[in-house]
């Protein structure tokens, strides 16, 4: 690719669109094909399902036992995804959508961080590397907390990078939110 072609690839929303397309291909392909195989994934799905059935979005349970081991946010996201998608509570793929979305957000955060600290090409390479890493692809297909934790961590690091580069009040406020 010529230098001009590379530069046009790195301008505007093209890098974000490319990374979004890559993530959609990697994270959404097969999301409904494989049933839950990880015991933790089944527990997260069941607890979110029970939350929807009971209408109690505060006291999380797995069967009869309270499930206070993980932050409640992932259960809320999974339950919201099932509700928004309008699927039967026993269909497993909507429970996985928050993980796929979180992995995508982490990729975009890494792109932005690389772009701010170095240049657009570094950001695109870093985002692509994260998007295609085996563990991220796997976690994007599983209804657990790992992808959401990755997104929260990379977003907070990106906000700190923004503060490092800009050193203004708005960047400070944004960084403090994370």
Residue positions per predicted region:
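Membrane-integral, polyisoprenol-dependent glycosyltransferases
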Residues: 2-178
């Amino acid at each position: 690719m010529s230098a001009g072609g590379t530069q046009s690839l790195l301008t505007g929303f093209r890098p974000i669109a490319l990374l979004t397309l890559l993530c959609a291909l990697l994270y959404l392909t097969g999301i409904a094909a494989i049933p839950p195989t990880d015991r933790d994934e089944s527990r997260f799905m069941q607890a979110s399902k029970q939350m929807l059935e009971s209408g109690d979005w505060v006291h999380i349970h797995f069967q009869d036992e309270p499930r206070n081991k993980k932050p409640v946010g992932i259960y809320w996201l999974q339950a919201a995804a099932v509700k928004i998608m309008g699927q039967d509570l026993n269909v497993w793929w909507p429970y996985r959508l928050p993980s796929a979305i979180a992995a995508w957000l982490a990729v975009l955060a890494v792109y932005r961080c690389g772009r701010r600290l170095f240049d657009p090409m570094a950001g695109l390479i870093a985002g692509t590397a994260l998007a295609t890493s085996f563990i991220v692809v796997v976690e994007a297909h599983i209804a657990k907390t790992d992808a959401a934790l990755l997104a929260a961590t990379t977003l907070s690091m990106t906000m700190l990078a923004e503060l490092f580069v800009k050193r203004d009040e708005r960047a400070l406020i944004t960084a403090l939110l994370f």
